[in-house]
Amino acid sequence: MEKRDFKEQLKKTAHLARLYLTPEEEELYAKQLQDILDYFKKLQEVDTSNIEPMAHVLSLSNIWREDEPKGSISQEEAFKNAPEIENLGFKIPRIIKREE
């Protein structure tokens, strides 16, 4: 099976997610990704020609109540305790700084 090096992709994804990975974690996660890919390749080799297709593996039934529209609070009521409103929305402080 084809082996891929996932380290660079992991570094890029971790950077975008603002995660710090140690070199040991990078090695571990790269190996785990390769193992997952290898497993999917094994699954592709399984002969399913005599298997009847299913929409879902479990029988699904809705055990919950029916959704019914109900009244809601007014926009004024929703905004009355908001510290700041901007463009008909709640304004909150920025929590992620952009890197230039």
Curated annotation (Swiss-Prot):
The encoding gene: gatC
Parts of the chain that traverse the membrane: none
Function per UniProt: Allows the formation of correctly charged Asn-tRNA(Asn) or Gln-tRNA(Gln) through the transamidation of misacylated Asp-tRNA(Asn) or Glu-tRNA(Gln) in organisms which lack either or both of asparaginyl-tRNA or glutaminyl-tRNA synthetases. The reaction takes place in the presence of glutamine and ATP through an activated phospho-Asp-tRNA(Asn) or phospho-Glu-tRNA(Gln).
GO-annotated molecular function: asparaginyl-tRNA synthase (glutamine-hydrolyzing) activity; ATP binding; glutaminyl-tRNA synthase (glutamine-hydrolyzing) activity
Organism superkingdom: Bacteria
Record-level GO BP terms: glutaminyl-tRNAGln biosynthesis via transamidation; regulation of translational fidelity; translation
Name listed for the protein in its UniProt record: Aspartyl/glutamyl-tRNA(Asn/Gln) amidotransferase subunit C
Principal EC category: ligase
Catalytic activity: L-glutamyl-tRNA(Gln) + L-glutamine + ATP + H2O = L-glutaminyl-tRNA(Gln) + L-glutamate + ADP + phosphate + H(+); L-aspartyl-tRNA(Asn) + L-glutamine + ATP + H2O = L-asparaginyl-tRNA(Asn) + L-glutamate + ADP + phosphate + 2 H(+)
Assembly: Heterotrimer of A, B and C subunits.
Stated family: Belongs to the GatC family.
Enzyme Commission number(s) from the entry: 6.3.5.-
Keyword ATP-binding in record: yes
